[in-house]
């Protein structure tokens, strides 16, 4: 298979794999606006914004490391990477639980504190869903990666229709958490990832190696959040949740254009990892860079 064909194939896998997590918010928009008031939709948008901010911080962006280091590694080394990253994320989740518990006792009143356990549920379920899905990219199971997007799409749709019309914001949170958990479990077993998981494979050197790669990525994630999401918490105090909900709806269509480039970027990273050690990699890389520019 030629490099261009491989890149196109990876793009198709990435698009399908992200249908549930990235595109469902757009496709379900007519239903969300029918089921939820503008204020309620503004609340759900803020919950997702806060969860997205904390996603890479709480997990130290470990999901980005887990699809890089297994490439070309021995099976034992892959087990070390996967088990170490998985256990590390579990420990981070426990620490986050206690931090959130402490924050919940603050006397301040805002969307974050009032819905702190909703945010925690969305955050942690998303951490493990993203980790298990991205691991498939690291072990060259892109077809499984894409199929998980279909699973997440189906579960999100079903749970949304079942829960949101009667439960409102609470139903939205349950549907999001349920879809993340279902997708993570499906990926974990369907990709045979469980075969790579063992507490005995914990490796301090592997953890250090992955953290050296992932921690420098955290500021980039935060800066992207500041660009795309900081206005939400600020506007909450100035214009209220009703106006925030209208703004969230209006921003869905322009956000699709950003997603299109994001899909290409993810597929390009996968292709670069696969081609990196080949002799003519520099020529190929520069050619693609000139084409994009």
For the regions a language model picked out, list residue spans one by one:
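Interhelical loop/hinge segments that connect adjacent transmembrane helices in multipass membrane
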Residues: 1-7, 117, 143, 185-228, ...
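Membrane-interface junctions at transmembrane-helix termini in multi-pass inner-membrane proteins
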Residues: 4, 8, 69-74, 124-148, ...
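Signature of the first transmembrane helix
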Residues: 5-63, 97, 101, 152-157, ...
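Helix-loop interface residues and adjacent transmembrane-helix termini in multi-pass membrane transporters
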Residues: 35-38, 109, 138-139, 166, ...
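Residues that define the loop-to-transmembrane-helix transition and helix capping
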Residues: 39-42, 83, 113, 142-143, ...
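Alpha-helical transmembrane segments of multi-pass membrane proteins
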Residues: 53, 57, 90-94, 98, ...
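Specific pore-lining/lateral-gate transmembrane helices of multi-pass inner-membrane transport
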Residues: 70-87, 246-293
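Hydrophobic alpha-helical transmembrane segments
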Residues: 113, 117-120, 147-193, 213
């Amino acid at each position: 298979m030629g490099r261009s064909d491989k890149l196109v194939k990876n793009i198709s896998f990435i698009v399908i794999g992200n249908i549930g997590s990235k595109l469902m918010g757009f496709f379900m928009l007519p239903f969300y606006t029918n089921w939820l008031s503008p204020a309620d939709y503004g609340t759900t948008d803020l919950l997702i914004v806060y969860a997205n901010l904390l996603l890479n911080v709480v997990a130290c962006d470990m999901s980005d490391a887990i699809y890089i280091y297994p490439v070309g590694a021995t099976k034992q080394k892959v087990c070390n990477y996967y088990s170490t990253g998985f256990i590390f994320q579990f420990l981070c989740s426990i620490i986050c639980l206690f931090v959130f518990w402490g924050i919940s006792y603050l006397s301040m009143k805002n969307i974050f504190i009032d819905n702190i356990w909703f945010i925690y549920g969305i955050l942690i379920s998303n951490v493990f869903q993203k980790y298990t899905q991205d691991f498939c990219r690291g072990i060259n199971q892109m077809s499984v990666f894409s199929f998980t997007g279909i699973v997440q799409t189906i579960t999100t749709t079903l749970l949304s229709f079942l829960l949101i019309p009667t439960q409102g914001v609470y139903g939205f949170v349950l549907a999001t958490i349920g879809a993340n958990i279902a997708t993570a479990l499906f990926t974990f077993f369907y990709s045979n990832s469980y075969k790579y998981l063992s507490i005995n494979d914990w490796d301090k050197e592997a953890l250090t190696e992955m953290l050296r790669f992932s921690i420098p990525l955290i500021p980039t994630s935060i800066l992207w959040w500041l660009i795309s999401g900081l206005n939400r918490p600020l506007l909450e105090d100035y214009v209220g949740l009703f106006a925030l909900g209208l703004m969230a709806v209006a921003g869905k269509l322009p956000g699709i254009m950003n997603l299109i480039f994001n899909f290409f970027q993810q597929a390009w990273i996968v292709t670069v990892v696969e081609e990196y050690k080949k002799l003519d990699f520099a020529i190929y890389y520069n050619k693609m860079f000139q084409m994009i520019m």
